Amino acid sequence: MNIAVVGLSHKTAPVEVREKLSIPEAKLEEVLAHLKSYPHIQEVAILSTCNRLEIYAVVTETEQGIIEISQFLSEKGHIPLHHLRRHLFILLHQDAVRHLMRVAAGLESLVLGEGQILAQVKNTHKLAQKYGGIGRLLDRLFKQAMTAGKRVRSETSIGTGAVSISSAAVELAQMKVIDICVCRVTIIGAGKMSRLLVQHLLSKGVSKIAIVNRSLRRAQELAGLFPEAQLQLHPLEEMINAVSVSDIVFTSTGATEPILNRSNLESIIAVNQSLMLVDISVPRNVDADVQQLEQIQSYNVDDLKAVVAANQESRRRLAQEAEGLLEEEVESFELWWRSLDTVPTISCLRDKVETIREQELEKALSRLGTEFAEKHQEVIEALTRGIVNKILHEPMVQLRAQQDIEARKRCLQSLQMLFDLDIEEQYT
C-alpha cells in the first residue's frame, strides 16, 4: 500500500491543458466515486484550483493505481495519454507527503507564500470526507498538511505582504495602461477573487468599477463589503453592454466554457476603442480567438508570472525557513504511518487479554457470592481493567516508538509467537 499524487500545475502545464482537467465542486462527488471504483484505489482526494489539479490516492498496488489515475485524467480531458504524460508529475510515499505539505504552505504556488491555497486544501479535505473519498491515511495526511501550512504562516514571515493572483492581475493591468485611475473597469464574477480585485483596484485609486454576476444578490453582497465605493451592479444579461463601455475587464467566474469570445465582442468594440481583458479563471472565461481582434489585449493566469517574479526573490529566502518546519511535519506523519503496522498486533493482544480478564473476573465474582458481587462488581471491574492497562501500556508505547523497522518487526513477531496471536494484516 502506498500514498501517491498524480497531477499537473502551472509549472508543468499551460492553462489550455489545465482547464481541460479542472473539476468543478458540483462534479466532485461523482468523480471521487468513479476513482474509488477502480480496483487499486482505496482512498482518494482531489485538489482542483486555477493553477493545479492534483489527485491524492492510497493505492493497494502502486503501478496499477498510477495507471488507473492517469487513464482517468486522459479520458476526462480528452487528451491522449502519450500527450498528457509530458505534463503530469507523479510522486510516491514520502515525496507525495512532502509535496502536499509544501502546497499547503504556499511553497508550490505561483505566488510564493499566498494564503488562499491553505483554505483550498482544507476544502479538499472537507469535501473528500463528505463524499467518502478518504479514509484513515489521507485523513491524517491532510490534517498534518493543514497543521504544516498554519505553522509556516505563524512561525515565518512568508505570508506577510504576499501578492495574490488578484493583486498580480491588477498590477499587470496597471503596467499596461498609462493611468489606471481613470480607467472604467468591469469585473465579471462576484466570488472571493472578485472581492480581492475590487480591494486592490480601490487601493490603486480606481473609482469606476462595475460588477457583473449571474446572481445579483451575490453582487449586492460584494458591494456591501465596500460601502465607500459606488460600484455599479449588473445581471449577467447586461454583460456585453457593461463590457462595451469598459477599458479593462477582469473575468473570474466558475463557468466551464468561455463567456467572452470574438463573436460577442467584435460587434461592440469601436474601431478606435482599446479593451484589455484579464482572465484569472480556469477553465478560461475568455476564448483565445479574441486575440484576432486588433483592439483587444488579452491576458490569462499564465501571463501573471512576470508580474509575480519581482515579488518572489525576497520570499525565496523566507521559504528556506519554512522548509525546516515542513520536515518536522513530514517526519511526524512518517512516524505515525510506520506505527500503523503495530496496530493489528496491539489490537489482537488487547482483545486476547480482555477476554482473559473477563473470564477470570466472572470466575472470581461467582466464588464471592451474589451479594458481594453485586455490591463490589464495579470496583473489581475497574481494578482488573486498570491492572491490564498498566501492564500493557509501557510495552505498547515502546513498540509504537521503535523507529528501527527491523527491530519493530522482530518485536511484533515475538509478541505474536509468545501470545499465539492470529493477526490480520492492515496498512502494510
Curated annotation (Swiss-Prot):
Binding site for substrate: T49, C50, N51, R52, S109, E114, G115, Q116, Q120
Documented EC number(s): 1.2.1.70
Catalyses which reaction(s): (S)-4-amino-5-oxopentanoate + tRNA(Glu) + NADP(+) = L-glutamyl-tRNA(Glu) + NADPH + H(+)
Pfam families: GlutR_dimer, GlutR_N, Shikimate_DH
GO terms of molecular function: glutamyl-tRNA reductase activity; NADP binding
Class of enzymatic activity (EC top level): oxidoreductase
Pathway assigned to this chain's UniProt record: Porphyrin-containing compound metabolism; protoporphyrin-IX biosynthesis; 5-aminolevulinate from L-glutamyl-tRNA(Glu): step 1/2; Porphyrin-containing compound metabolism; chlorophyll biosynthesis
Active site: C50 (nucleophile)
Keyword field contains Phosphoprotein: no
Binding site for NADP(+): G189, A190, G191, K192, M193, S194
Subunit structure: Homodimer.
Domain statement: Possesses an unusual extended V-shaped dimeric structure with each monomer consisting of three distinct domains arranged along a curved 'spinal' alpha-helix. The N-terminal catalytic domain specifically recognizes the glutamate moiety of the substrate. The second domain is the NADPH-binding domain, and the third C-terminal domain is responsible for dimerization.
Protein name: Glutamyl-tRNA reductase
